[in-house]
Amino acid sequence: MEKIKVKEIFNNVYSVDFGDGLKRIATKSLIPGKRVYGEKLVYSDNIEYRVWNPNKSKLGAAIINGLKKMPIKKGTKVLYLGASAGTTPSHVADIAENSLVYALEFAPRIMREFIDSCNERKNLIPVLGDANRPQDYSNIVEKVDVIFEDVAQPNQAEILVKNAKWFLKENGYAMISIKARSVDVTKNPREIFAEQKKILIEGGFEIVDEVNIEPFEKDHMMMVGIWKGN
């Protein structure tokens, strides 16, 4: 481990300066000494931090690229759609600290990887299910403050609205990483982002932030919305 300069930029999210001019972020290690995806562990004032790799996390990429609204913070209850093997959910769990993060994944094999890498994080609740069918996991997931979605499906925006109706508190927040090529490979990504935004607004969201996450992910846009219901 090595010495670094640390500055809090959002609640429980930190910029880390190694003195080389590169922009990096990190979260405090909820489980000190435990890596999830081979990330670098560093320390400052006897506190361990996990460097958050924006090449492996769309939320990390959005923060690096200038995200202004970051609704996930200490005490935030989160539903994470598209947990994959747990890279970003592990950082979300660090930020939320003792608050629950429900991590939904569709593929059983990937869910096994997730459980293996994140089993010590007691606030991460693995949920095997299809994000298109929130009724199937409504007996597990409670009302949440934030929904985060990273699901590569053509109906990405509709999935978020559907889950918000089931689980998101009024005036709660949602964050969605829209992958244009998963919606329609033939259209200009800017058209797709506009269409997906329209679906979100008509579904009951007020969009309060948008961040393009290139060069970390091509044709991806992070949107942040407040749930007003409908």
UniProtKB/Swiss-Prot annotation:
Entry EC number(s): 2.1.1.-
Record-linked InterPro entries: Fibrillarin, Fibrillarin_CS, SAM-dependent_MTases_sf
SMART domains: Fibrillarin
Binding site for S-adenosyl-L-methionine: T87, T88, E105, F106, D130, A131, D150, V151, A152, Q153
Entry keyword annotation includes Plastid: no
Domain of life assignment: Archaea
GO MF terms, alphabetically ordered: histone H2AQ104 methyltransferase activity; RNA binding; rRNA methyltransferase activity
Keywords of the record: Methyltransferase, RNA-binding, rRNA processing, Transferase, tRNA processing
Family annotation (Pfam families): Fibrillarin (PF01269)
Family matches, as CDD domains: AdoMet_MTases (cd02440)
EC supergroup of this enzyme: transferase
Keyword Transferase: yes
GO biological process, one term: box C/D sno(s)RNA 3'-end processing
PANTHER family membership: FIBRILLARIN, RRNA 2-O-METHYLTRANSFERASE FIBRILLARIN
Function: Involved in pre-rRNA and tRNA processing. Utilizes the methyl donor S-adenosyl-L-methionine to catalyze the site-specific 2'-hydroxyl methylation of ribose moieties in rRNA and tRNA. Site specificity is provided by a guide RNA that base pairs with the substrate. Methylation occurs at a characteristic distance from the sequence involved in base pairing with the guide RNA.
Subunit structure: Interacts with nop5. Component of box C/D small ribonucleoprotein (sRNP) particles that contain rpl7ae, FlpA and nop5, plus a guide RNA.
Recorded family membership: Belongs to the methyltransferase superfamily. Fibrillarin family.
Name of the protein this chain belongs to: Fibrillarin-like rRNA/tRNA 2'-O-methyltransferase
Organism this protein belongs to: Methanococcus maripaludis (strain C5 / ATCC BAA-1333)
Gene that this sequence comes from: flpA
